[in-house]
Amino acid sequence: MNRAVKIRIYPNKEQRVQIEQTIGCSRFIYNQMLADKISYYQKEKKMLRNTPAGYKKEYPWLKEVDSLALANAQLHLESAFRKFFREPACGFPRYKSKKHARNSYTTNVLKGNILLQDTHLKLPKMSVIRIKLHRQIPSDWKLKSVTVSREPSGKYFASLLFCCENQTVEKRPAERFLGIDFAMQGMCVFSTGERAGYPMFYRKAEKKLAREQRKLSHCEKESRNYQKQKKRVALCHEKIKNQRKDFQHKLSRELAERYDAVCVEDLNLKGMSGGLHLGKGVQDNGYGQFLFMLGYKLEECGKHLIKVDRYFASSKICSVCGHKKKELALSDRMYVCECGNRMDRDVNAAVNIREEGKRIYKECA
């Protein structure tokens, strides 16, 4: 099992220059290799097998940065091509832009070239960087790779990937089940009748964000004031992102500890965001990110995340008698059945998802 820990790093001026240089060289290699592959295929109708080493003679400044960062750029390009050939809908690999807000590079542990201490991190071709380690790393975790990134706000982070050989937990029998139904207000509803109560951080910060973006639009592009204001806008977005992640981490941890199996619908969130004109609501919820967090936390505990088919009529079926309605408008917020059952439609759907999840679990057991 692999585990990642993201930490804040505090590079000095010289180290920031080295990080930016490595990011730039990694981007250059990716784009150059992609351009050469396209050009070669157009002429020869074959895939070019090029490597970063073949470019160092023509571009000697590539030797100044970590060679493993360039090798990882090659791996990322090859991965993009494999994904395209496997799923053409993903799109053909695209060039990486220098103006992209978030830039990063990845390097690997090889013969002790990376050292992690309580207050410092040693990276290849760089002096030790001051860090803030917010959690104790278990002694049996083995460091595999480090991804150094710069956020739009100008902050630098390092994502440490560890191999945890002794962390694999056997699946335990499930007794306590929970059903979760997606909801526009509050992110989701539980089969217990409770709501997640997500505070809609983006909606709350929308006025302030609009004000800061309006100020940015009045600045002269690429001026010093423009860069300062751009950073303020980025800090607003970063705060919203951090608030959302903090809420979701705490909620997913609580559910993973309380229940043996959590049942959810396998929704097409991207389609809902665009097709139903629910873009801001779906994206502010971050429901997909929440399910990802919940999934790996349940796996760590040896518990189960059960996905119910998205076409299962969870909203139309009565959770008491099983009667299925032919029509149910999106505006109908209460589920009223002929049997006398009257409850919130989202709670009714969550109960149905839980029962369908139980059925799937018993079939697979």
Q: What are the functions of these language-model segments?
A:
Residues 1-365:
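Nucleic-acid substrate recognition interfaces
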